[in-house]
Every structure is written in C-alpha cells, then in structure tokens.
Amino acid sequence: MRARELRAQTLDQMKDELVKLKKEQFNLRFQKATGQLEKVSRVKQVRRDIARVKTFLRQKINENKV
C-alpha cells in the first residue's frame, strides 16, 4: 500500500484496511507455523503496511483534533 493511497482514504477506510491487514497477518503466521507459507517476504510486507496504516491513522486523528 502506498502512502499516497493512504492519505486519500477516510478514517473508516483506514480502520477497515487495518482490520484486513491484521487478519492477513494472523493467517500468514498460522501458515508459517504449519509450514505452508510460500511467500515468506509477505510477512514483512504486511507488518510494515500495518505500521504505515497506523501512522497515517494517527496523523488523521491528530489533524481532526486541531
């Protein structure tokens, strides 16, 4: 997910995206534990996407407070 795309999203869209990414992260961890994970790099990518979404979510919340 690109930063440009995140900036254009609303708070609700970002929250939905965060839930989706957390579910994907859970599934990837489960696949890794059972030895079924094919794309190991996806774990790192999802983790960073979660951090990116949380960062922009916090920025939007702070902008609305001011």
From Swiss-Prot:
Any one GO molecular-function label of the UniProt entry: structural constituent of ribosome
Coiled-coil region(s): none
Keyword Ribosomal protein: yes
Pfam families membership: Ribosomal_L29
InterPro entries: Ribosomal_protein_uL29, Ribosomal_uL29, Ribosomal_uL29_sf
One GO BP: translation
Keywords tagged on the record: Ribonucleoprotein, Ribosomal protein
A single cellular component GO annotation: cytosolic large ribosomal subunit
Keyword Zinc: no
Record-stated family: Belongs to the universal ribosomal protein uL29 family.
Record protein name field: Large ribosomal subunit protein uL29
Highest classification ranks of the organism: Bacteria, Pseudomonadati, Pseudomonadota, Alphaproteobacteria, Hyphomicrobiales
